[in-house]
Amino acid sequence: MTSPGDSADPQTGFEPDDIEPEGIEPESKDWTWVLQKACPDCGFDARSVAGPQVASGLRANAARWPAVFKRPDVGARPRPRVWSPLEYGCHVRDVCRLFESRLELIRSQVDPSFENWDQDATAIADAYGAQDPAVVSRELSAAAESAAAAFGEVGDGDWARTGRRSNGSVFTIETLGQYFLHDLTHHLHDVHG
């Protein structure tokens, strides 16, 4: 017979039921509208961010995440179908990596198509809720800095280069950066960071 806490993850201290990724509604919303108007939830207005400002915005956002990972409830979901701050942090880390790779694709090819990425399948496959918050904190900081450095290297004449998603949505490097920065800002808002 086990007592409460015997099945807890030794690194996070969370019970398996607290971190099970199932039960999250898959994201199906097309968020490209955030490039045209301010987000009513997080307040981010992509139109107010010029391409060269993306790098500093990414760094400022990343600087706020370490405090989130130090919370005692970082692995707890606020509601059953809402990611925990830890899961959001894992997602943000992976989004940083994804958008840096998309940026490099646009910079190295003419109007490339981006591979689809299923964020929900990734969360389950990579067991976001079971990851070590201290490790994720370091990885998010490194991924955000790498992405910020890549956006910081974009030359003045390259901000209009394009790439596209499989659904046909076209991004310039500038709008890709704006969209990316909104995603990170929105998720920091989601976790009250």
Predicted feature locations:
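Short, contiguous alpha-helical
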Residues: 2-36, 73-123, 156-193
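Short low-complexity stretches enriched in small and charged residues
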Residues: 43-47, 54-55, 103-105, 143-144
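Hydrophobic alpha-helical segments and helix-packing faces
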Residues: 51-54, 58, 81-85, 92, ...
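A glycine-rich, hydrophobic loop/mini-helix early in the fold
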Residues: 55-83
